[in-house]
Amino acid sequence: YLRWQRELPRIVPFYAVKCNPEPVVLQLLAALGTGFDCASNGEIQTILDMGLSPSRIIYANPCKASSFVRRAASQNVSLTTFDNVDELVKMKRFHPDCKLVLRILTDDSKSVCQLGIKFGAPLKEVPRLLAKARELELDVVGVSFHVGSGCYDPEAFRDAVFRARKAFDMGREHGFIFDLLDIGGGFEHFNFEAIAAVLRSGLAEHFPDEAFAPGGTHVEGKPSGLRIIAEPGRYFVQSAFVLATNIIARRLSAEDEAAESGGAQPEAMYYQNDGTYGAFNCIMFDHQTVQPKVLSVSEQFVYRDDLPAPGVGTAQFELRPCSVWGPTCDSIDCILRMTHLPSALDVGDWLVYENMGAYTLCAASSFNGLSPSKVRFTIGSDASDDAAAVLCLLDSVRRADLC
């Protein structure tokens, strides 16, 4: 969060609840002052149940069920996105006083999870949508975009900001004075500074202070000027969670199997207590690549966080080719068809997977009657000052009014 404040002080983060709705995560981010990007009434209710004001929520789902719109109106959630005429008609009928944000289509080809195939109005459609909103006497207050989840090309944000400015200008032509820009998500840890630099440059070029700061020429009648928000999800939580899995079974390949396959056959198949129907659904739905590190061998702790996978010294342990599987009876429940782990690894030992905080447990199922992995929160032994600050913030959530 402090890194965000340092690099993007002009932009208020609205955490994407869908990414990881663990209560402690939400409480900590609420105490830090973030808003919340909610995609359903259930997520909205989760935030409201924390005692937060509806003003800290954007209902960032352009295509909502009518019943959800009615519920949002009853919950006093008054900011949502749209990208089509039917949604405007729906809003007019069920939530006519809601403030609307037009989601535009951007180039998301440089992202791991591309969303443009499902959401976002092309720029050529913007005039028609704004004309319909004007006809229905609806209040369109701004523009949003999303470059896709897990964006690996910072320049995608520059192009998206350029398109957003085009939509802002179209809004003025239709009598709207927009004062909200929602730059969506797509933020990654490894290139965050590069993305932030592109955003600062793009915003300075297309949304300069002289035009969009309070009193600016493009925000007449808007005392607060242009408000810029974002919807980061994995940026906040991906690296904050690690998943430890227990090896519940092992199947060794017969020597003749390995010989017949020319050595390509895994010498061992390990079965662990979480799989693709659990936290590892991220492999299928979020296109994540995971690599295990060894936590224990022969019930002895061997994990080293300073080494790449498998997290043990090769001089200390002989590695062999193997595969890793989840606990269900479905053959699609495969974590890795080929990796290398210590030959001494046995039933009862543990593996650990880093960067498992985003789009993992939130989509886990109970297939085969199995329960999702439990979450345990720790504060670390080498960050006492940070730990104390976190505990203080969480305590403030429980005691204070955060509205």
Identify the function of each model-found stretch.
Residues S53, P122, K222, R398-R399:
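Short, solvent-exposed coil/turn linker segments
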Residues D49-L52, A73-S74, K92-H95, S111, ...:
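Solvent-exposed alpha-helices and their adjacent loops that cap or buttress functional pockets
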Residues V198, P208-H218, R227-C403:
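Charged (often Lys/Glu-rich) extended helix/loop segments that serve as interaction or gating elements
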Residues V17, G185, A230-P232:
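A general secondary-structure junction signal
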Residues Y1:
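Conserved oxyanion/phosphate-binding beta-strand-loop segments in alpha/beta enzyme cores
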Residues I11-L180, F187, F192-E193, G202-F207, ...:
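Active-site-proximal beta-alpha core segment in soluble small-molecule metabolic enzymes
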